[in-house]
A protein has these predicted regions:
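Metal-dependent phosphoesterase signature
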Residues: 25-42
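Short amphipathic alpha-helical segments
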Residues: 28-30, 70-73, 130-133, 232-233, ...
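Asp-based, Mg2+/Mn2+-dependent phosphohydrolase catalytic module
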Residues: 1-17, 38, 45, 49-50, ...
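Gly/Thr-rich phosphate-binding beta-strand-loop-beta motif of the actin/hexokinase/Hsp70
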Residues: 16-18, 25, 130, 320, ...
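Asp-based phosphoryl-transfer active-site loop
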Residues: 8-28, 327
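N-terminal loops that bind phosphate or other acidic moieties
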Residues: 152-502
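Conserved Rossmann-like nucleotide-cofactor binding loop
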Residues: 22, 125, 273
Length: 502
């Protein structure tokens, strides 16, 4: 995304920026100062000029050999020096990030308290310097304009914004699809559920024929669960972080399936317990390092749950703005079938034993233990009326983010293909928060986890595939992408009987 930034970030007076990797291309280490040629990253100059009327700007950068004057001379070459009210280098303050002195000095020069400042950077040390100074931080994963948009959305409440923009599916487009199918060169109803899918796509997008999705993307949200330590899974929690790294290296099942069907994979750290640094290809939106053990009490606070909902909504909105026209849900989190079962039981008022499955293949003893934990956790939600309170009590960060992802897809009239039991739990949360949100979704497949079928039944969704999958990651939903594309293509490219007579 290289578009300009057009609005202020609520609660922020000063925006501080790292330089190398954030404003300009990172120079090769050891390059002599005299040989440095600043090359602005795409959209940076335009974005800074659009931002300047709304916020005071400054830069905080690590360099062992350049003082403020030398750095400003380089920035003047790309026309942004005049926009920066303060430029602080590690050479000037005698400390590199994550030491907060550079951030604090920039805030002092600009006359603002650190809690009213936002630092934007591309490295883990930038994030840690902001935290140590008490400032906000956003990673420049997808360009400066995108980082600013995410910062603004998170301050305003991206989920609430998306929820307010959701409208009912288009009944006229649905009827137009039915009418067109009746005119196509085939017996009425002979394409079976493919016709139903075409009608649904028309209603979701508000267009008949519906657009043929050409840029599908799988949003894989990763988070850890305190309940994983309670004996509900044979896998160690560290597997979550290892799999996130595997996704980044494109070596996981979802990467292979996505390549086959022409989809992009976007991985988001919303709550992995381990510090992942700033791995390339990962969006770093960690709300907290994993949830607490839901066997002992609430998995998280309602503030955590709402923050994760915002993350999902922000990511979906950004992906749609980048031109993606089909959203697919994916996830990773050791132990996450336990909170999913708890959410499904609580939100569908189904007996926990009926929705709790074997997850990664646990034995009978572990299943009985897992079911007891789910039963006790669900009992704590009996008096809750607010779905966010239920989500906070027994849910997960990646599940919350998926719920936000789904709602933002609906807000943008983009179809969302949901995956297995984790995604079904997220969709139940989304549907409890925004009426009839499931109308905007397509069930990609039926997971072999028992809770998935119960959730789909309550949501009124019939899955496109039933391959006895239980991996997650978005694999089943991703496999359904060609079917979704075909349903739209049929409405575009089949001739009508009237056209045959011409």
């Amino acid at each position: 995304m290289t578009g300009q930034f057009h609005d202020a970030i609520p609660g922020i007076d000063v925006v501080l920026l790292d330089i190398g990797g954030t404003l300009v291309e990172q120079a090769v280490p050891g390059t002599p100062v005299g040989a440095l040629v600043p090359r602005p990253l795409p959209g940076v100059v335009e974005t800074l000029r659009a931002l300047a009327p709304h916020h005071r700007l400054g830069a905080v950068t690590d360099t062992a050999v350049m003082d403020e004057a030398a750095v400003r001379a380089l920035l003047a070459q790309i026309g942004v020096d005049d926009l920066l009210g303060a430029v602080v280098t590690s050479c000037d303050v005698g400390a590199e990030k994550p030491d907060p002195r550079g951030v604090l000095e920039a805030c002092r020069r600009l006359g603002v308290a650190p809690e009213r400042a936002l630092l934007i950077g591309d490295r883990a040390v930038d994030r840690d310097a902001a935290a140590n100074a008490g400032a906000a931080f956003v990673a420049v994963d997808r360009g400066l304009a995108d980082a600013l948009a995410r910062a603004r959305a998170s301050r305003r409440g991206a989920f609430a914004d998306a929820a307010a923009r959701v409208t009912p599916c288009d009944a006229d487009a649905f009827a137009a699809s039915q009418a067109r199918h009746a005119q196509l060169t085939k017996p009425a109803g002979s394409l079976g559920r493919l016709e139903d899918l075409g009608h649904r796509l028309a209603a979701i997008t508000g267009r008949c024929p519906p657009p043929i999705p050409t840029r599908p993307v799988v949003g894989v949200f990763a988070g850890d669960h305190g309940v994983a330590r309670a004996g509900v899974t044979p896998w160690p929690q560290d597997i979550t972080a290892a799999m996130v790294a595997n996704f980044a290296r494109r070596g996981a099942a979802i990467n292979a399936v996505a390549r086959q069907v022409g989809a992009t994979v976007q991985v988001v750290d919303v709550g992995v317990a381990r510090d992942l640094g700033l791995i390339d290809g990962i969006l770093h939106h960690k709300v907290r390092p994993g949830t607490d053990d839901l066997a002992l009490g609430p998995a998280m606070t309602t503030a955590d749950a709402r923050a994760a909902l915002d993350v999902g909504a922000e990511v979906a909105t950004s992906l749609v703005a980048d031109g993606h026209d089909l959203l697919v849900t994916g996830e990773m989190g050791i132990g996450n079938t336990t909170p999913s079962a708890a959410l499904i039981a609580a939100l569908t008022h189904t007996a926990p034993a009926a929705v709790t499955g074997r997850g990664t293949g646990i034995d009978d003893g572990m299943l009985a233990h897992k079911t007891k934990i789910v039963t006790n956790a669900v009992a704590r939600t009996d008096t809750y009326l607010d779905p966010v309170s239920v989500l906070a009590e027994v849910g997960g960060l990646e599940i919350a983010a998926l719920a936000g992802f789904i709602v933002a897809g609906a807000a943008n009239n983009v179809p969302v293909v949901v995956d297995g039991v984790i995604a079904c739990a997220a969709l139940l949360v989304a549907d409890a928060l925004v009426a009839n949100i499931a109308d905007h979704c397509i069930a990609g497949h039926r997971s072999s986890e028992p809770g998935a079928s119960i959730a789909l039944g309550c949501l009124g969704l019939a899955p496109l595939l039933d391959l006895e999958l239980r991996l997650g990651e978005g694999t089943g939903a991703c496999l359904a992408i060609p079917i979704v594309q075909t349903a739209a293509r049929v409405l575009h490219e089949m001739a009508t009987f009237d056209e045959l007579e011409q």
